[in-house]
Amino acid sequence: MIYLSVPYSGMEELSFEVSCLMAAFLMKTGATVLSPIIQGHVLASKYDMPCDHEFWLKHDLEMLKKCDEMYVIALPGWEKSVGVQREIEEAGRLGIPIVFLEAAGLIPKGD
C-alpha cells in the first residue's frame, strides 16, 4: 500500500485536488493508495472534526505504519512542511521506501 504524502497547510484546496488526482492515477494502475489528505480534508470540512495539526499527524503516522512505501508529491513548500518532514522521518525510521514525485502537470491551471 502506498502512503501519499502532500503538504497541506496554507494550500488546502490545491493539496486536496492534487491528492485526488494522484490517488486516482495510481489506483487506475492497480496500486492501493492511502491518502490522509483526502480522508482528513473531507472529514474536517464536512463533519466538524478538529483542524489542528497534531490531531491529524497522530492519525497519519499510525496509517503510515501499515504502508509498504511512501510517495511524496513535491508541491511548493514541501521541504518546509512540518507534516511532510515528520512523515519522511517516520518512514525512514520504519524502513519504508520513499519516492519523490514532481508536481508538474498535477497543479490545475490558474493555481
Language model features: what each stretch is:
Residues 1-111:
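Conserved catalytic or regulatory cores that recognize and/or transform ribose-phosphate-containing ligands
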